[in-house]
């Protein structure tokens, strides 16, 4: 089949790499670079990113890693050990150690909640915040997790998504860091597409998608079209109206920091439940020193954008950083706000659009993630669903 793909972000490139083995693939990208919000930005010798945090939520074992191997991508992913720690009263705790901070009654409640979640025996129609709200520390920890992983508060996160996330965590484990950062992944996918005689056309803005007896991207004719741009933007340029409900984008702010001393000892996430805004941070140079100049560390913080006053949100994040570093020398490299047409996710978890519109038209990307898929894992889940469906036609 001849397959046209709109958008060369992670979803479009992953779909293209997997499908180009047996099909003729053409990828259209309006920007002068590939990877969308999953590639590197070189700045003062540091490998910053256009969006992601140089981390894959389920490391070398999750859906993205499996899809990369299926595509034949040569990407090395180092699993984080530990997955993460939680900073409470100036001290780091592993998840299981958090229970020691609770009184007897709260500890009993917490164990009960943790067991219910692991077994999936909870009310799926409530929010994660409602599930946790009887225990103050649990709610703070929950907000830190959903803020870092989903760019949502615990109250904005459906319990149905948390149940699926928990299943995936118990199945695959925690995060990992791709050596070379995000760009190592997207560069490898573009290499595979070209090796399989696929085409990638950069700086080309698609004006129209037409689905009829054949599928069209402007004047190009295809058997199948896959859109990796936002579902809302896709519908605007398409003759098919497929959105039954409007997806809700998630907003966030990332701050990249240079430091010689470092702030984290491990390659996982440091969750910050007591911060005013920052939900967590990582120090990827503990695993891959090539992401910073010699003698330096790259630290990246992430926070959910809680209000529409972006300047205030950034200022609160900077205050958190000052408190976290406690007199250590550091330098702010870059502040990035993800909202409007360049959000964290085009559809927040729980509002994703189905991948399959019809036999000629499909959606991938962070507006069409699989259930319980954190960021790029959700993208990979959606891509695998589309690829399997197309290959079964």
From Swiss-Prot:
Domain of life: Archaea
Pfam families per UniProt: NAD_binding_8
InterPro entries: FAD/NAD-bd_sf
Name this polypeptide is given: Uncharacterized protein MJ1488
């Amino acid at each position: 089949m001849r397959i046209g793909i709109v958008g060369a972000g992670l979803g479009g490139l992953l779909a293209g790499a997997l499908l180009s083995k047996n099909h003729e693939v053409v990828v259209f990208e309006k920007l002068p670079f590939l990877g969308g919000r999953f590639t590197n930005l070189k700045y003062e010798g540091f490998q910053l990113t256009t969006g992601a945090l140089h981390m894959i939520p389920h490391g070398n074992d999750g859906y993205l890693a499996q899809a990369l191997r299926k595509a034949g991508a040569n990407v090395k992913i180092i699993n984080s050990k530990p997955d993460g720690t939680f900073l409470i009263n100036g001290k780091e705790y592993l998840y299981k150690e958090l229970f020691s901070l609770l009184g007897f009654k709260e500890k009993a409640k917490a164990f009960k909640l943790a067991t219910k979640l692991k077994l999936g025996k909870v009310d799926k129609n409530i929010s994660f915040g409602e599930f946790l709200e009887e225990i103050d520390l649990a709610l703070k920890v929950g907000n830190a997790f959903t803020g870092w992983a989903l760019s949502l508060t615990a109250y904005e996160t459906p319990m149905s998504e948390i149940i699926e996330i928990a299943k995936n965590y118990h199945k695959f484990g925690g995060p990992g860091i791709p050596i070379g950062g995000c760009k190592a992944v997207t560069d490898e996918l573009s290499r595979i597409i070209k090796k399989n005689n696929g085409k990638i056309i950069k700086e080309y803005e698609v004006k129209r998608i037409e689905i009829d007896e054949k599928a069209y991207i402007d004047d190009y004719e295809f058997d199948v079209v896959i859109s990796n741009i936002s579902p809302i933007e896709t519908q605007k340029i398409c003759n098919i109206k497929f959105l039954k409900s409007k997806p809700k984008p998630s907003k966030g702010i990332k701050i990249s920091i240079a430091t010689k001393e470092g702030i984290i000892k491990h390659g996982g996430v440091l969750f910050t439940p007591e911060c005013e805004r920052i939900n967590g941070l990582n120090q990827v140079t503990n695993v891959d020193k090539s992401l910073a100049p010699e003698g330096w560390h790259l630290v990246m913080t992430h926070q959910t954008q809680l209000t529409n006053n972006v300047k205030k949100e950034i200022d609160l994040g900077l205050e958190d950083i000052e408190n976290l570093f406690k007199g250590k020398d550091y330098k702010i490299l870059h502040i990035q706000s993800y909202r409007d047409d360049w959000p964290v996710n085009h559809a927040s978890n729980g509002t994703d659009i189905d991948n399959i519109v019809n036999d000629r038209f499909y959606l991938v990307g962070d507006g069409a993630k699989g259930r319980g898929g954190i960021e790029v894992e959700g993208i990979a889940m959606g891509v695998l669903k589309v690829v399997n469906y197309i290959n079964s036609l």
